[in-house]
Amino acid sequence: MVKVAVVGASGYAGSQLCRIISRHEKLELTGLFVSENSLDKGKKISELYGELNGLCDKVLQPLTGAKDIIDIADAVFLATDHKVSHDIAPALVDAGVAVFDLSGAFRISNTDVFEKAYGFAHEHKDLLKKAVYALAEYVDVKALQNTKMISLPGCYPTASQLALKPLIENGLLDLNYRPSINAVSGVSGAGRKAKLTNSFCEVSLNAYGVFTHRHQPEIAEHLGTEVIFTPHLGDFKRGIHATINAKLKDGVTPEQVAKAYSYYDNKPLVRVKKGMPKLQDVQYLPFCDIGYAMKDNYIVICSCIDNLLKGASAQAVQVLNLYYGFDETQGLI
């Protein structure tokens, strides 16, 4: 059994990790941690999330330092603020703990771009170079298994990259025209902390972070091309629906596009649909559903994920499964 801890367990992604790990036959959940000033410390996780009652009743412990984790875990999920992950990851890696980081602290390799996106300077450049960015369907498993620092993609980047990578890697897009990504996320993507804009009577459908969202440089770096990314907040609980417009090279055929997407034929958590996917088909599930339509030299791709699962906790466990050589769907389906 692999001993696993979760930091940031009281958040939405953290709670989903607790649920998945508790049902995983090869993982033992050894510790749940929150910040020292959290109002949730000392409570059982099941007091916050009734779905965990009887499944995971562990107490949320205040995290005093890396040693709390090192003493009890082979691997840790950091479902934390970016700065928290940035600060604690080096000590964990040095102690031999496998770090699966759900924050953005190690996603962007250019430190100048990182600082502009996240608002603080990256102080661990050596570890940043060693970090493996683990989009599950594309990660180099050998490289993954040779590091202790695993950076997990963001929710929007997961939906966007899974939709576009087959076309880009097969050279089918005319990249003189930037792909345009318009993605709508449920309110859970904004986190559990109460905010006026996320309250029941205030939440609406609106664009935000136009040209400034920190996921834009992440998407661009790992696709290898610039994109136009416009995120939206939707008036629903969970899920992401991304609609992507792109230009195909002259002469690209439907058969070439279909062959490109056949890459996912042996990827159990990506489903390529004949029509356009529906958000309801992936909510509370670990899948990414993709559909597309072509006309002239243009293609519209739609990609749907559950932002808390394929966009966060389920992908994190999927990558852990790959890291330890388990079936990648272990504990997920």
Model-identified regions with their sequence ranges:
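Short Gly/Pro-enriched turn/cap motifs at secondary-structure boundaries
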Residues: 207-211, 233-235, 278-282
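Short, solvent-exposed beta-strand edge segments and adjacent coil->beta transition regions
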Residues: 147, 239-243, 298-300
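C-terminal active-site/capping subdomain that shapes the small-molecule cofactor and substrate pocket
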Residues: 245-333
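C-terminal substrate-binding/catalytic lobe of Rossmann-fold NAD(P)-dependent dehydrogenases
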Residues: 197, 211-272
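N-terminal Rossmann-like NAD(P) cofactor-binding subdomain of oxidoreductases
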Residues: 2-201, 206-208, 294-295, 330-332
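Predominant activation on well-ordered alpha-helical scaffold segments within soluble catalytic domains
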Residues: 18, 161-168, 216-220, 258, ...
